[in-house]
Amino acid sequence: MTLPPKLFDHSILKIRRNRTDENSWFMHDKAIEEINDRLSEINRDFEKIAIIGFRAKSWAKKLNLNATYINDGDLINFDGKSYDLIIHAMGLHWANDPVGQLIQMKRALIPDGLVISVFFGGQTLSELRISFAYAEAKILNGISPRIAPMGEIRDLGGLLQRAGLALPVADNIKFDVSYETPLQLMHDLRGMAETNIIIDRSRKTMTKKFFDEISKQYFHHFSDNNGRINSTFELIFLTGRSEEHTSELQSRPHLV
């Protein structure tokens, strides 16, 4: 089987995740709240649960679930076990082979098992991405991949079908977060371990001149009436089943 080319450097991701800051995990909390709401709408008790992600233990505690914790590398180690609920927690946007991960999850489901994956979508950090582009064009006369590409919801729903999951549903929620400066935003991104891990990323250190230009462009294009900047965070939710079944499952609008 031919594997897709690797886009992300997971060795760097692991290092950065070891340096995360709890005070910057607010988007995980937003995702947990939404997952909790969705699970509460399902008339079913899940007994065999797996949570995939580097913060799986924290997720299980906040969701009040007795779950197995699994790392989210390209190969997911289910250790031969099967589950009726698998939650992929804020990591699929860093997958080199997201379809492959969904297929692995499908294979680890018992009949009528449920997969829920939540991760950052393509509108995340759109303002910072544009500000980087303006600054690079002005200072460096070119544009490099400073922020990792993230999928658009119109495309991501198809991943569920490609993985062979039944009853595929894709939807999103956007959050606007206010900051005093771009530096505060970047501090949060480091605290989340959501900085650039593209293998072909620029290794050059940002100069003060370059960073000042990024800030200038950000404030010029995306500041509000209070002199603060806005940053978009988009959460994508993918939901699928191991097979068609008549058990009750409340779901968001079908978008795939």
What is the meaning of each model-derived region?
Residues M1-E33:
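N-terminal, positively charged/glycine-rich alpha-helical extensions of SAM-dependent methyltransferases
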Residues S24, D171-E243, S247:
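Conserved Class I S-adenosyl-L-methionine
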Residues F26-E47, S58:
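Conserved alpha-helix/loop element of class I SAM-dependent methyltransferases that forms part
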Residues I76-I86:
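A short acidic, Gly/Pro-enriched loop at the edge of an enzyme's catalytic core
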Residues M90-W94:
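Short catalytic micro-motifs in class I SAM-dependent methyltransferases
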Residues V99-L114:
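A short glycine-rich, Lys/Arg-flanked "PGG" loop and its adjoining helix->strand segment in the class I
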Residues V118-T181, M192-K204:
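Conserved catalytic/acceptor-binding region of the Class I
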Residues H245-V256:
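Positively charged, low-complexity/disordered segments
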